[in-house]
């Protein structure tokens, strides 16, 4: 390896919005980063996954404006 051309590889502290923090090695220029989700709070990994959109766009439209169109013709 050539000297002086490779970025410095150092420890980085990552803190999640849930409060979980862990350390990893990276060439990132920062000493710490903030994450929105991690494996401790992500719905897929926690098993608390929920279906956000059960209906389609047409169902959502009919739910919002169905009462308006059914009254007059």
Curated annotation (Swiss-Prot):
Biological-process GO terms, alphabetical: translation
Gene3D superfamilies, per database record: Ribosomal protein L31
Transmembrane segments: none
Gene Ontology MF: a single term: metal ion binding
Note describing how the cofactor binds: Binds 1 zinc ion per subunit.
Required cofactor(s): Zn(2+)
Protein keywords: Metal-binding, Ribonucleoprotein, Ribosomal protein, RNA-binding, rRNA-binding, Zinc
InterPro entries: Ribosomal_bL28/bL31-like_sf, Ribosomal_bL31, Ribosomal_bL31_A, Ribosomal_bL31_sf
Residues annotated for Zn(2+) binding in this entry: 16, 18, 38, 41
Similarity comment: family membership: Belongs to the bacterial ribosomal protein bL31 family. Type A subfamily.
Subunit structure, interactors included: Part of the 50S ribosomal subunit.
Protein name: Large ribosomal subunit protein bL31
